[in-house]
Amino acid sequence: MASGSCSAFNFNQMLDGVCKYVQGVQQYLTELETSTQGTVDLGTMFNLQFRMQILSQYMESVSNILTAVNTEMITMARAVKGS
C-alpha cells in the first residue's frame, strides 16, 4: 500500500502487484526459452518453481485476508441487527 497504512485494504493495488509478479515470471520464461533454445536445466526449473511457490503463498495469504474480512463483516452485521 502506497500510503503505508493498514487501515484500508486496496484491492486494486493488490491485483496490480500480482499482475506485475506474473509478468516478471512470464518475462523470465521468455528469456529462458530464448537463451536455451527450449532446453532447460535443473537449476532453472528450481528457480521457476521457487517463484511460483512465492506467488502461490501470496495468493493464499490474500485469500485468508479476504476470509477474515468477510467473517468480520458478518459479525458486525449480526451485532448491528442484534442477533
Curated annotation (Swiss-Prot):
Molecular function as annotated in GO: identical protein binding
Pfam families: DUF5407
Family statement: Belongs to the chlamydial CPn_0710/CT_666/TC_0037 family.
Protein name, as recorded: Uncharacterized protein CT_666
